[in-house]
């Protein structure tokens, strides 16, 4: 009888813990605004921002879902922010153009806030036979350069269009 009581208690505890874990995991994919001392960015629904990321990047957000078939090793979308403190704005923009493969659009924003330069770039690359669309927003502010790069598998570009627009529109350097 005691074994039955202990067994029921263990099962109840496992259900409780499992429910808590599922709720925490679901909450991690909810939209939120990430704000640091240097920039602010909106993380849309369906993306997770790993807290203990050791990539050296200022911000990382990965889509919940992975690609399918030949793209199964890629996230459907990924966003990263790099802070560069020892380079030239034009060099960073040129490097982004080279990395973006086929350039679909590029422009310097004329209405940038005072003291900032902004460059927008959209490109298309292929990695392991998988087409990837990249969106870049590069901002020079003070002595630093902030590089937002969003990569989305071409197959899912339309599904992520609104979320990508929200993320790029919200990217703000202080």
What are these regions (language model features)?
Residues 42, 112-120, 168-174:
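Short flexible/disordered coil segments
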Residues 1-27:
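N-terminal signal-anchor transmembrane alpha helix of single-pass membrane proteins
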Residues 39-42, 140, 163:
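Structural motif
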Residues 45-47, 144-174:
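Surface-exposed amphipathic alpha-helical segments
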Residues 16-18, 39, 146, 160:
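Aromatic side chains
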Residues 38, 83-87, 162:
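Residue-level detector of secondary-structure boundary/capping sites
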Residues 25-58:
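N-terminal "mature-domain start" segment
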Residues 50-147, 152, 156:
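Conserved polar/disulfide-associated segments of primarily extracytoplasmic proteins
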């Amino acid at each position: 009888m005691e074994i039955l009581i202990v067994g029921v208690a263990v099962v109840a505890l496992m259900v409780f813990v499992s429910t808590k874990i599922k709720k925490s995991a679901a909450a991690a994919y909810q939209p939120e605004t990430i704000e640091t001392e240097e920039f602010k960015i909106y993380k849309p629904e369906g993306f997770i921002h790993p807290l203990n990321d050791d990539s050296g990047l200022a911000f990382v957000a990965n889509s919940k879902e992975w690609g399918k078939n030949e793209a199964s090793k890629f996230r459907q979308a990924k966003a990263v922010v790099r802070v560069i403190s020892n380079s030239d704005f034009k060099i960073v923009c040129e490097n982004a153009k080279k990395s973006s493969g086929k350039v679909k659009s590029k422009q310097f924003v004329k209405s940038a806030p005072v003291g900032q330069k902004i460059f927008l770039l959209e490109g298309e690359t292929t990695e392991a036979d998988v087409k990837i669309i990249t969106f870049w927003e590069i901002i020079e502010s003070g002595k630093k350069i902030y590089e937002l790069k969003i990569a989305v598998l071409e197959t899912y570009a339309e599904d992520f269009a609104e979320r990508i627009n929200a993320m790029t529109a919200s990217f703000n350097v202080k």
